[in-house]
Amino acid sequence: MNAKEFLIELLKFKSVTPNDDGALNFIAMELSDFEAFFIEKEGIKNLLLTKKFKDEGEHLAFGGHVDVVPAGEGWSNNAFAPVEKEGFIYARGAQDMKSGVAAFVDAVKNADFKGARLSLILTSDEEGEAIYGTKAVLEWMQERDMLPDYAVVAEPTCVKKIGDSIKIGRRGSINGKLLIRGKQGHVAYPEKCINPVHDFAPVLKLLAGFDLDPGSAEFSPSKIVITDIRGGMEVCNVTPNDLKLMFNVRNSPDTSLEDVKSYVEKICHGLNYELELKQSSEAFLTNIDNKIVQKMNESVQKITHEVPELNTKGGTSDARYFAKYGVKVVEFGVCNDRIHAIDERVSIEEFEKLCLVFKDLIENF
C-alpha cells in the first residue's frame, strides 16, 4: 500500500495509551525485511525494527509513538474511523503522531540508504508516564551495543506550515511543591494566629514568574510558573493552618534542580516551610553543527522550500531519552495546530512532503 493508505490504516487502531491495539504488529508486517524485536516492560509494548546494510558506517534511527490521547466527546465523526475531506485526514493521532510514524515507515521502505544500519524505535507509552517505552528500548539496545549514532523523532514540530521548525533540543521540567505552615485560629484574634498567607505574601512576588537564568540563543529563560495555590477552609472566620503551592520550571541546561532549591530556600528564609522538588525530564541540546542537524536542515529546505527555525520550544518528548543515551537527535514533523484537539487532522500535502523529507535525509546521510 502507498503512504497515505498506510497512514489511514494506522489511524484506525484505537491505540489509546498504553494499548497499541495491534498497531505495532501492523507496522512490523509492513517492514517484513527488517528484524523485529518486541520489547515489553511492565506491560508496555514496544517495537524495535532494525536492518543492517553493511559492517562499517553510521547507524540512523527514527523514533515515534503509536499511542494517542483519548478522543473524548464532540467529534464530527468517529475519531478512529479516518475521514478524508478537503485535503485533510481527520482522526485521533493524525498529527500526533501517526503521520510521522507512517512517513518514516514509507521513507525506509523506499530510500536508498548508504550507511550501516537503519532502525525504527516505536512505543505505545509516550502520552502517558513514558517510563517503560522508548527509554526501555534504548536500554535494551545499549545492553547489546546497538545504540544508534543519530536519531530523528517525528513529533509534529511545525507551527504554520511544514518546514518552518526543527527542534534541536528541549527544556527540562522541574515540579515543585511548597508547604507554608501556620497556626489556625479565630479571625477576630489575628495576634493569636500564625497566618501562612500573610507570611508568604511578600515572598510570592519573588517567586511568581521569576527567571532563574537570562536564557540564551537556544533556550528561553527558566521561569518559575505557579500552577496552584490554596489555603484555608473556604470560610471567613478561620485563618488557614497552612498554605500549599505548586509550581513548575521549564529549565534550560543553565538551571538545575539545585539552583531552584537554593533560590526558594533563600526567599523563604525565616518561614516554617517544606519544599519538595522533582525533575521529571532533563534538558538537552544537539549542537547546530552536528551532522543530524545539518542534514535535516538541508532536506527540509530542499523539499519544503522553507528555512526552518532551529529551536527548543514546547514541552517534553521522547527525544530526551535519545539524548540521555548519547544519541544525537532532532525532531521534525507536520504542523501541530490540532494536536490533542477535537477533530484532529493532518494536511495530506504536509504528510506527503514529510515522507519526501525523510526519504531525502536517508539517501543523503
From Swiss-Prot:
Active site: D67, E126
Cofactor binding note: Binds 2 Zn(2+) or Co(2+) ions per subunit.
Residues reported in the UniProt entry to bind Zn(2+) 1: H65, D96, E155
Residues of the signal peptide: none
Residues holding Zn(2+) 2: D96, E127, H340
PROSITE patterns: ARGE_DAPE_CPG2_1 (PS00758), ARGE_DAPE_CPG2_2 (PS00759)
Reaction(s) catalysed by this chain's protein: N-succinyl-(2S,6S)-2,6-diaminopimelate + H2O = (2S,6S)-2,6-diaminopimelate + succinate
Name of the protein described by the UniProt record: Succinyl-diaminopimelate desuccinylase
Native source species: Campylobacter jejuni subsp. jejuni serotype O:23/36 (strain 81-176)
Gene designation: dapE
